[in-house]
Amino acid sequence: MVIVTDSNFLDAAGTLRKGLLYCDFVAIDFEFLGLDVSAISLHDTVESRYQILRDNVIKYRPCQLGLTLFKQKSNRAYKADTYSVPLFQRFGDNDTSISLPSMRFLVKNKFNLNQVFMDGVEFCTRKEFKKFERALLAGTAASYLSREVKSQIELLKVMVHEKCYQSTSYHITHRTDEPMQKIPLKMKPNSSVSLRMPRNLSSVEKYMIIYELTKAFPQFLFTCDEKQQNLHVKNISDDYLKEKDNLERARARCSESVKGVSAILQVVHMTGKLVVGHNSLLDAMYMYHYFFSHLPANYQMFKDKFNALFPRIMDTKLLAQALRFELPGVGDSLENLGDYFGSDKSDKTVPPELRGFIEPWMNPLEDESENVYHNAGFDSYVTGEVFLKLAHIYINRRNNFKNEILDFDRIYQYLEAPILNRLPFQLMDVGCCYLTGDDSKGFRPDVITIVRRDRVAIEEDEFRYLEKALGTLMATYQFDIEWSKNKKELFLATNSPGSYAFLCEKFSNDSSLAPLDELDSGKKWTFEQRQTAWRSFKNRGVGIGINAKRIRAQNQATKIQRAMEI
């Protein structure tokens, strides 16, 4: 894994761009400064869930980006380069929040928060970058800098005068911009002077200082040494540069440092590479909001705009769910999948060329200390590795192929129809977020409608008691309860047939409350009948609106009645 920080980002950017041009696909993962799931409910519609996730993205910034570039070689085996990039935006909107539970979780998993805040790589949206570019051209970009850094720039201008020209006391004591315009400073050919740079500067601050000095002294070339502690000054004529080219080069370097890692994701967009993630809807939203443009106000617009930027994205969680019978007990979490495919247990399920660790491609294996889950770099590698292995199992078994390695183009062709541009929703009655079409239907049990047997309104005290009692009763089983606007109905949402049947049976035996479908039909069903006929009505557009409750109850009763007759 290569750790890319603010200190070495501009040096590593060239290798990253080259890798993106030649790789077959890129796996991406983010870590965030927080994630608030308290507002998420099983009752959410796609629009309400999008708004909850959007609020999270805006509230908590990303703190780490993981990129792994995968390349299939001539022998069909794969190579991969992994990059771990701490993220820290110094010059954008400073309004952000930090979740202490999330921070404790990251630190527990050996996450280096100090690296984020001290050496995180800059990033920005397109709008933020254009604003900076305008300021740069207008000569007002120094407004992005602190007062302390501005003072250091003025001090360095004076030091350039002292080092490069024997000025009179008049020139030393007056404003430095006056002698810059009137007195041509020159140095002896092939000679240089060194100035001490301020400590603890970000790359943006460093290149802004160089740019401001170049504007003041375009006849000089300013460069920093490897340790970035000394500023070297020499004549541009020694490098056969013109003043205009010298200033343009300093300006371009300044712009590149401000754009930061956003420029790398721009390359992903421009090359149209396949992007692979795991449970990646939130990652997609983070990538859009912080590196391209602010998230749209509604869900459909997000789908359209994100797909325009990244027309090819696949998610390993959906592949794992499709293979749940072929890989029993493995599950669909990244850790479980990574552990399974990293062990000998998986050797018989994947081609020999994919067994074990995928070797580095263009970069040596620099640092294994961060090869832990919840490091975005390592997670991106595991995501890509899991994707390749799941894809081969899926394609080979669905088509009765031998356990053989496939060309990447064939993998893409086989997965295009069932997997491409589909991102999983968690705890929702929707199959997935389909970026290029209508979202697929989910497989969750119907919402249970509970009413009083005498059909009168449910009092608030009774609702609060039920809410607390059911929370204790259901323990770790997922469920959510809502109260209708007319106070006469309770809506219970579950995520499994067993919990659905359990709640139906509980209220079927209750003396004061009952499932609406039983009261309407005059029939009562057993736990087993409920468990095998739990899906009766599904309409994505209706959701759980008031007008649909009666239809749902009637359809549910009809479905269960048919099951009894069989």
UniProtKB/Swiss-Prot annotation:
| Entry keyword S-adenosyl-L-methionine | no
Q: Which GO terms describe its cellular component?
A: cytoplasm; endoplasmic reticulum; nucleus; P granule
Record keywords = Cytoplasm, Exonuclease, Hydrolase, Magnesium, Metal-binding, Nuclease, RNA-mediated gene silencing
Indicate where this protein is primarily found: cytoplasm
Q: Which residues bind a divalent metal cation?
A: 29, 31, 283, 379
Location(s) in or outside the cell:
Cytoplasm
> Where expressed (tissues)?
Expressed in germline cells.
Q: Where is this site: Interaction with poly(A)?
A: 317
What phenotype has been reported when the gene encoding this protein is knocked out? Slight changes of mRNA bulk poly(A) tail lengths. Animals display a reduced brood size at elevated temperature of 25 degrees Celsius compared to wild-type. Accumulation of untrimmed piRNAs with 3' extensions, which are stable and able to co-localize with the piwi protein prg-1. However, while the expression levels of piRNAs remain unchanged, the piwi-dependent mRNA silencing is reduced, as is the production of piwi-dependent secondary small interfering RNAs (siRNAs), also called 22G-RNAs, on mRNA targets. 5'-end processing and methylation of 3'-ends are unaffected.
**Pfam families recorded:** CAF1 (PF04857)
Q: Which SUPFAM superfamilies match?
A: Ribonuclease H-like
Q: Which family does it belong to?
A: Belongs to the CAF1 family.
PANTHER family in the cross-refs:
POLY A -SPECIFIC RIBONUCLEASE/TARGET OF EGR1, MEMBER 1 (PTHR15092), POLY(A)-SPECIFIC RIBONUCLEASE PNLDC1 (PTHR15092:SF22)
What's this chain's function? Involved in transcriptome surveillance. Required for piwi-interacting RNAs (piRNAs) 3'-end trimming, which is important for both fertility and piRNA-directed gene silencing. Has 3' to 5' exonuclease activity in vitro.
Name this protein carries in UniProt: 3'-5' exoribonuclease parn-1
The record lists the organism as: Caenorhabditis elegans
Q: Lineage of this protein's species? A: Eukaryota, Metazoa, Ecdysozoa, Nematoda, Chromadorea
**This protein's encoding gene:** parn-1
